[in-house]
């Protein structure tokens, strides 16, 4: 897609190893800069691709003299059990990589882990991934809310992920206009009068679907028990009203905050919305 659109050759240098941890792609110095990171615990992992700095030494250092436009990153499952430091680790890694490529603002685009059963920590990992958008300047995300498969760890439609990476790069790195870089990102949630108003950003033409039910929303009251909620678009804006008959006095709203879910909220270009929650509770099924 980049070749066809830009009319110039575009190459990709691939450094990858399935099931790797983010720590393996980082230098010892970058790892030590992350407060709370436990080296002994990381070194105890049995899988070679999860050992600290191993893939950094073998697959990043040998290529850091090549010039490049930016980075594409698709990883996360290898850190699903220690997700709490993921955003900090990724921020430190990107800072280090940009230093080595001598470009402090080098674009860094990453894919969200897709839905799929297997580990209850996945929604928390995804939350950390989305948090990186605010922590890493000039970063972007490929949302994969619609690409999962119930009993698979990874998205089976890898070609669609690649196309969305291309769309993101064309919009952000190459400044092309006329299409959004990604799906709807959460701007804010206001809960009042028994309902929630959910507002999205970077969605100038509004949300979809407009003609049938929007799925994936849940609400909870003081008992912290979540129930499916109904959502409707407000006047063709990037705004939703979310309500739930079973929860007359809601205090929390979630969207797609499970390991496995099926949702249908997108922008008018068909790019899916991000998962989110307004609470900080640990109850996830």
Put a short name on every predicted segment:
Residues 1-285:
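Cell-envelope and extracellular/periplasmic
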């Amino acid at each position: 897609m980049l070749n066809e659109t830009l009319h110039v050759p575009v190459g990709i240098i691939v450094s990858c190893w399935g099931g790797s941890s983010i720590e393996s792609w980082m230098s010892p110095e970058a790892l030590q800069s992350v407060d709370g990171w436990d080296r002994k615990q990381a070194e105890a992992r049995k899988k070679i691709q999860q050992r600290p700095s191993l893939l950094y030494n073998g697959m990043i250092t040998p290529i850091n003299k090549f010039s490049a436009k930016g980075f594409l990153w698709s990883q996360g499952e290898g850190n699903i059990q220690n997700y709490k430091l993921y955003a900090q680790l990724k921020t430190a890694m990107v800072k280090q990589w940009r230093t080595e490529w001598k470009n402090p603002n080098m674009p860094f685009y990453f894919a969200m882990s897709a839905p799929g059963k297997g580990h209850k920590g996945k929604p928390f990992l995804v939350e950390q991934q989305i948090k990186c958008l605010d922590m890493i300047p000039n970063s972007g995300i490929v949302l994969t809310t619609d690409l999962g498969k119930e009993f698979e760890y990874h998205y089976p439609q890898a070609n669609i992920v690649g196309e969305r990476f291309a769309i993101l790069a064309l919009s952000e790195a190459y400044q092309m206009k006329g299409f959004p870089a990604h799906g709807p990102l959460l701007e804010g949630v206001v809960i009042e009068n028994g309902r929630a108003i959910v507002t999205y950003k970077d969605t100038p033409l509004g949300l979809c679907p407009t003609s049938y039910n929007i799925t994936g929303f849940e609400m909870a009251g003081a008992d912290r028990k979540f129930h499916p909620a109904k959502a409707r678009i407000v006047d063709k804006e990037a705004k939703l009203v979310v309500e739930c008959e079973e929860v007359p006095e809601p205090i929390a709203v979630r969207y797609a905050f499970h390991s496995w879910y099926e949702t249908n909220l997108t922008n008018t270009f068909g790019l899916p919305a991000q998962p989110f929650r307004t609470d900080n509770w640990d109850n996830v099924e």
